[in-house]
């Protein structure tokens, strides 16, 4: 019977199972995710070579001018040394994982989850998937509020493959796209996009993309040759007048 159980376990029947239990489901960027991984033995003992936790996010990739959905592994950790789980034994292994500053906020179509995988020799590896609610840092929230107070309306939020000039820093970026509702800005701008490159409690580094509205022949030619988009890299600190600093940066591209 023992040999038969081992054969069944090798194809996933009566094998060990895994369930990751998070201490909470909602986290802020840069916070530490904590919890336990619960492994329950199946009908026979099995050797658990490794337990991996991998942080994933979905994102949009552009291939041949078509947008396709994909997923990116943002971080992975191993939480154990090899051990044997006995039949019907229950074992809990605690873990902690830092959320990197590049993890997207879970708004719009953006999703973030932890995938738990067991590496079991000569067997189908069981797995588990737990979704997270990710909130921006306090300072990032203040930046987004300041942009809206300047007269911009948040139109959409997308997580996309990082452009080539940022791929040495991150695989993906989350773009907050704003449409102007302010009459002063509307004369000069079509839209505004903001990407958070780094976030901490005391500062945020952002990339602002300003899409200028075409004005006259010169503006038409700029737009025709994709020269109408300007980039601003800006670091904002917790003691800054955020709204004034953003306004100065945006208006510098309107002149």
What is each of the regions a protein language model found here?
Residues 1-255:
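Terminal, compositionally biased non-globular sequences in eukaryotic proteins
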């Amino acid at each position: 019977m023992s040999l038969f159980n081992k054969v069944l376990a090798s194809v996933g029947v009566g094998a060990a199972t895994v369930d990751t239990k998070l201490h909470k489901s909602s986290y802020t960027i840069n916070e530490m995710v904590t919890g336990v991984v619960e492994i329950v033995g199946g009908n026979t003992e099995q050797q658990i070579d490794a337990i991996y936790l991998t942080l994933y996010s979905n994102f949009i990739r552009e291939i041949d001018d078509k947008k396709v959905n994909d997923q990116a592994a943002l971080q992975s950790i191993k939480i154990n040394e090899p051990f044997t789980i006995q039949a019907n034994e229950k074992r809990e292994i605690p873990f902690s994982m830092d959320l990197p500053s590049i993890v997207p906020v879970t708004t719009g179509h953006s999703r973030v989850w932890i995938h738990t995988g067991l590496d079991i020799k000569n067997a189908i590896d069981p797995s588990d998937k737990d979704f997270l609610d990710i909130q921006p840092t306090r300072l990032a929230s203040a930046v987004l509020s300041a942009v809206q107070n300047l007269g911009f309306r948040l139109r959409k939020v997308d997580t996309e493959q990082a452009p080539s000039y940022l791929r040495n820093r991150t695989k993906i970026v989350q773009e907050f796209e704003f449409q102007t509702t302010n009459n002063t800005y509307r004369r000069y701008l079509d839209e505004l996009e903001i990407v958070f490159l780094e976030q901490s409690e005391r500062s945020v580094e952002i990339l602002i993309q300003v899409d200028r509205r075409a004005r006259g022949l010169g503006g038409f030619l700029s737009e025709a040759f994709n020269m109408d988009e300007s980039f601003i890299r800006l670091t904002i600190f917790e003691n800054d007048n955020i709204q004034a600093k953003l306004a100065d940066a945006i208006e510098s591209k309107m002149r």
